[in-house]
Amino acid sequence: GWLMGQGHCVAAIEALNLLTGNQHPEQAARYARDEAGMSRLAADFYSYAQAADGRPGVPLGSHVNPHTAGGIAEGGYLGFAELQYAHLPLPGEKLVAFLSDGAAEEQRGSDWMPRWWRAEDCGVALPVMIANGRRIEQRTELGTHEGLEGFRQHLRLCGFDPLSFDGRDPAAFVCALWEMEQRLAHRVGELNDKVLAYPLPMPYGIAETTKGYGFFGAGSNAAHNLPLPASPARDEQARELFNQHAAALWVEPQRLSAACNLFASRKGRALERDNPLALRQPPQPVQPPLQFHDHACSPMSALDRYFVDLVRANPQLRPRVGNPDELASNRLGGVLAALRHRVSQPESELESVHGAVITALNEEAVVSACLANQGGLNLVASYEAFCVKMLGAVRQSLIFARQQKEAGRPAGWLGWPLVATSHTWENGKNQQSHQDTTFCEALLGEMHDVMRVLLPADHNSLLALLPEIYQTRGRLACLVAAKRERPCFFTVEQAQQLARDGALQVAEGGGGEPVLLIASGSYQLSEMRRAAVRLSEKGV
């Protein structure tokens, strides 16, 4: 399979898909491999046509989308492919991840992939940076020889094994990918022979090229978008420039057809649209018994026991826990003891070379580990205030899942919760820096069929939510949950009704004009119950 961080390069992918016959039915019907079909593809891509309902009027998009055969991520935000590629393939699978040199400036989470990759539970992951030396408005640091050489040294310090090659030559890509795969296999062999230990030197391709290579404006800011100085349809000079540079890229039809037929003649390989990463459909998880009770405790203890039991009941599903640092503080000590931090050199019984807990003080990196683990079971827990830093990565996955559903090919990955705890009602001691409700409020604006926002009040109401969360496909849940000890508000039956209906009347009294007291979450419910008593005393 493939992953591309630069989603706006989708035009090249769509063109290759057409040439190789790697298309979904809606594209195959509209874009045949002939002059008319190719012309229609080019015209549609720049038409920005809209249907009556506001959706795109053609099966194309500005970025990788569910109509793009083999596409698994939009690539709308630079930097997230870098954080996800090592966690995407399962054992026996192979993934090539095309990355951006501009995204290398985004953050350092991408440096840690050798720390997380394990041959025992990960497939082959081959990152390739397209080092074209430019972002949108200016040259990148990697656009200089000194910057590129410094980046190679940086990669080595992070545990990568950099391999530079000519990014202007398609054959060089093939050779480089083969070489990278051989190097990784050799390192795994040395690991098995106890010559090496984790982290293994992870091959990292650097395709040195020029932005806009082969066309007018190459190597300049103009290469980002439409490099011609004017529209060739209306301006003679622009038309001459277009014809001059397009002529150098033109391939004679018979030669192009022969090359396409050669690709089509290869047997025994699935089309990219049918690769396992694009068709994730893990088995429905076996549900563990639910341990309801009626005594006061941290609501998080329900999740702590449930997730450990769920993982044990489903050894065929790879677990990942995203942890920005305080798993034990957030009352998930059982999860930590059972699954342990993934490290290279364990220093306690809570750490293991093969741990399933991805821990880093980088919220985007740890949530990306779970967003990428689409063939397994996932859990992310963080202080509510720090969840805000996950929002962009989460929205990218939600948008793609919603588009998959609209295209008639819904996502098959199993749902899981993003837990916002140590929340605003609990964090007064840390003042406003730790009191931020942005995350759940923003997710309330997402479509309900791909995101639920849930505010359970106690152990039982949180526990009753979990089976459906983990059985639903292509849908995440934001759980805002207290971590301190809280009373048991609900019986088993009430908790299950609340999980099913979304709201529950807990008390009613008095006559006359009703006064509604509405609570969301544990602390509000306590205060509303106190308020109800006092209002009743006043005859309200």
Model-based region annotation:
Residues 2-8, 53-74, 100-104, 166-170, ...:
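Active-site nucleophile and cofactor-binding loops and adjacent substrate-binding regions
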Residues 61-257, 431, 435-540:
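Glycine-rich ThDP/TPP pyrophosphate-binding loop and its adjacent helix/strand module
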Residues 1, 8, 23-58, 69-75, ...:
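Long, compositionally biased, glycine/small-hydrophobic-enriched stretches that function as flexible linkers
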Residues 21-25, 260-412, 473-475, 485, ...:
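Non-catalytic terminal/interface segments that mediate subunit docking, oligomerization
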Residues 1-119, 144, 333-335, 364-373, ...:
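Cofactor-binding active-site loop characterized by glycine-rich and histidine/acidic residues
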Residues 24-32, 117-128, 157, 345, ...:
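A glycine-rich helix N-cap at a beta->alpha junction
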Residues 57, 400-403, 433-438:
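Flexible, small-/acidic-enriched active-site or ligand-binding loops
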Residues 2-3, 28-34, 91-98, 128, ...:
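Beta-strand segments within the central parallel beta-sheet cores of soluble alpha/beta enzyme folds
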